[in-house]
Each structure stands twice: as C-alpha cells, then as structure tokens.
Design a protein with these regions (language model features):
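C-terminal-of-GTPase-core extension/linker across diverse P-loop GTPases
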Residues: 1-47, 51-68, 72-83, 88-274
Length: 274
C-alpha cells in the first residue's frame, strides 16, 4: 500500500506496486511540488521505505540491509506515516513498527489505506451495529487507538490509493506535524502544566517518598525534549511517565509528536554547578 499511495501523490507509476508484501526493498525518494488550492505550492520529499520485519524473521542479507535503510529513513524524516490495511486492521507488526518510530523520536500519523473497500463493505450491509458510516469510521478509529495506545494521540487519516479518496489530507497532515514540532513552549507555562499534572495525580509513594519536580525547561525539538530538575530520577516510573506525556501533549496540542523527558537529579545538578 505504501508504494501505491506514493504513486497516487506523485500521479505516476515510478514505484513498483505489487500485491506481494515486501516488494519494496530500497527506500525510494521522490520530490513533490504540490499545488494546493488557494495556498500556493507545497514542497515535499516522499520516501517510500522497505517494510521492516523483526530480526529473527529476516531471511536474507538484502532484507537485512533494507531494514537498516528503512531505519535510517525514519531517523531523517520530519513526519512518518504508518500505513495500515483497512481490511486487516492493526497487526502485531504494525505495533512493532509504531514503537520503533516512536523510539526514534519521529512525529507519526496513521494512514488507513483501502478505506473505499471498508466503505463498500459497510454499505453492502455486511456490518451491523452502526447507525451510519461516520459512526463506523469513529468506531474503527477508536479500535486503532486502543491497539496503539502508547502513541502520542497520532492523527488517523482514512485514504484510498486506488480511488484517490482524501489523498490531499496526507500532505496537509505532514505540514501540520512539521509545523507543530517547531512550537516553542514557554518556561512559565511548562512549569505550571507539569505542576498541575503532579498535583492532579501524585506519583506513587516509594519507601515513604514521591517523585518531585522542582523546575522544567524545554531544551530541544524534533522530538520535544523537556528537562526536569527533580529529586530522584529512579522514582519516575514508566506508567507515570506515560501519564505525564499524555497530559503534556494534550495541553500543548502536540498530536503525533513524541516528548522526551530528560531527568536531572539533585546530586547531578549540584555536581554540575560545582
């Protein structure tokens, strides 16, 4: 589906399209100047990557190096789109890929391809329990978010490479993700938000002590990097970290954009000052 979507955007057949998963073995780059109605020309570089499989599933040297190139393409991208087949839903491999993209700190959106087929199935009466197509789509999106619960509220875009349905939304979403990643986060507001999250749901008591944050400041973008000056970094539990990330992203409006909390404990802070 990836190559078909790229070809639709490029209005060409430059990329090999096949029904056999894994046909693309190289990351193929193409520049695109898109004339948007009333908004001038948008410039993009599209990268159609090779699909990735887990190491123990890789069965050839070519595929191994294809995986490495895909990883490199992800690292250098401003926005990554994970393509899901509407007929299959979220697979285990999709979950693994989504986690890999998040680990690289890339902004991520979900593309549900072949949505025209899902719509036809609904209109044909094969699906029950939905009042209309919108309710069906909302339910489908909710199921995706449950399967990919660890993602930072990534946009979900329903498209069809075959018919061209909602294709421009891919480019609009890419522009939005790119712009969001340059958002400056005022230090005063950062500290109020982090303080509010800590107060709303205090960290767990561990041996009579809680994780505390004394001061917060933004130190980078792509991904957002937030320095937390705290008491003891080891008390920042994984579940609480996810809660803080979700609250942070929700307040500042950072859909699809990961956040990295960089923790500096009291002892480390004082040693730096010395």
């Amino acid at each position: 589906g990836k190559s078909s979507l790229c070809n639709r955007l490029l209005a060409s057949d430059r990329m090999i399209v096949s029904d056999v998963p894994g046909t693309t073995r190289e990351s193929v780059e193409r520049d695109l100047d898109y004339e948007s109605k009333g908004e001038g020309t948008w410039g993009f570089r599209l990268v159609d990557t090779a699909g990735m499989r887990r190491k123990r599933k890789v069965d050839s040297t070519l595929e191994y190096f294809s995986n490495l190139r895909t990883k490199g393409a992800i690292e250098s991208s401003d926005a990554v789109f994970l393509v899901i087949d509407a007929q299959d839903g979220v697979t285990k491999q999709d979950q693994i890929l989504a986690e890999s993209i998040l680990d690289e700190g890339r902004a991520l959106a979900i593309l549900v391809n072949k949505w025209d087929q899902a719509q036809d199935t609904f209109r044909g009466g094969a699906l029950e329990g939905y009042a209309n197509l919108k309710e069906f789509r909302d339910s489908y999106e909710e199921s995706i978010r449950k399967e990919l619960f660890f993602l930072p509220d990534s946009p979900v875009v329903f498209v069809s490479a075959q018919t061209g349905f909602a294709i421009e939304r891919i480019l609009r979403t890419a522009r939005q993700l790119d712009a969001i990643q340059e958002t400056p986060l005022p230090t005063g507001e950062l500290n109020r938000v982090i303080g509010g999250l800590l107060e709303r749901q205090p960290p767990t008591l561990i041996r009579g002590k809680r994780f505390k944050v004394y001061y917060t400041v933004q130190v980078g973008t792509r991904p957002f990097r937030i320095r937390l000056f705290c008491n003891q970094p080891h008390r920042f539990e994984k579940g609480y970290k996810r809660y803080m990330e979700k609250g942070f992203q929700s307040h500042f409006g950072l859909p699809g954009c990961p956040v990295r909390f960089l923790l500096t404990g009291k002892e480390e802070r004082y040693s730096r000052e010395d």
